[in-house]
From Swiss-Prot:
Main location group: membrane
Spans within the Extracellular topological domain: 17-155
Subcellular location: Membrane; Cell membrane
First and last residue of the signal peptide: 1-16
Gene label: Ptcra
Residues glycosylated per entry: N67, N117
Keyword Transmembrane: yes
Cysteines paired by S-S bonds: C47-C107
Protein name as it appears in the record: Pre T-cell antigen receptor alpha
Region (Disordered): 117-139
InterPro entries: Ig-like_dom_sf, Ig-like_fold, PTCRA
PANTHER family assigned: PRE T-CELL ANTIGEN RECEPTOR ALPHA
GO cellular component: plasma membrane
Lineage, top ranks: Eukaryota, Metazoa, Chordata, Craniata, Vertebrata
Segments passing through the bilayer: 156-176
Length: 199
């Protein structure tokens, strides 16, 4: 379930990520998102690795901070992509107190044992301007709720119109079927006259 949520998240936030070159893993950092967990601010960072090594090979994904230390992160994959390649994910959650100690963040990947590491550009997480852009404002959430409500009302109206169309179609079919089942009107011929006129 978590992997599905992350794939949806990346599909919405990173719709134009470049792919790897000649089967070389290519790590990309998604824009960080600020969440409230138990009343505390946490920054979620996701690293998407395209053209990762298939299962069975030692393909690593990890994060490092500005001081060069590796950070504990959750990794998912590799998962098959529609184009036949493999994709891996790395997820890192940092509290607001840890941001300054670990930034800038870098995502690293290594295709196999002895392979060359590939890294992303450093990602700065703190800063007044950047944090405003990454935090989901309440007005945005309210706007999303309004859009969901409008979409639900529109779906309800379309469903009612569909039911009305089905009802009218069924009524018409019943009328036509009833006409076909009625016996044809009997044509009674007048009895032949036995009276002969004498001339």
């Amino acid at each position: 379930m978590a992997r599905t949520w992350l794939l949806l998240f990346l599909g919405l936030r990173c719709q134009a990520l470049p792919s790897g070159i000649a089967g070389t893993p290519f790590p990309s950092l998604a824009p960080p998102v600020t969440l409230l967990v138990d009343g505390r601010r946490h920054t979620l960072v996701v690293c998407l690795v395209l053209d990762a090594a298939p299962p069975g090979l030692d393909s690593l994904v990890w994060f490092s901070g500005g001081n060069g230390s590796a950070l504990d992160a959750f990794t998912y994959g590799p998962s098959p992509a529609p184009d036949g390649t493999w994709t891996s994910l790395g997820q890192l959650s940092l509290s607001s107190e840890e941001l300054e100690a670990w930034e800038p963040l870098v995502c690293h990947t290594r295709p196999a044992a002895g392979g060359l590491n590939r890294s992303t550009h450093p990602l700065q997480l703190s800063g007044e301007e950047a944090s405003t852009d990454r935090t989901c404002p309440q007005e945005t959430l309210r706007g999303t709720q309004r859009q969901v409500l409008r979409l639900s009302v529109l779906r309800l109206l379309l469903f009612k119109l569909l039911l009305l169309d089905v009802f009218l179609t069924c009524s018409r079919l019943c009328v036509l079927a009833g006409q076909h089942l009625l016996p044809p009107p009997s044509s009674k011929q007048a009895p032949a006259s036995t009276h002969q006129s004498w001339t």
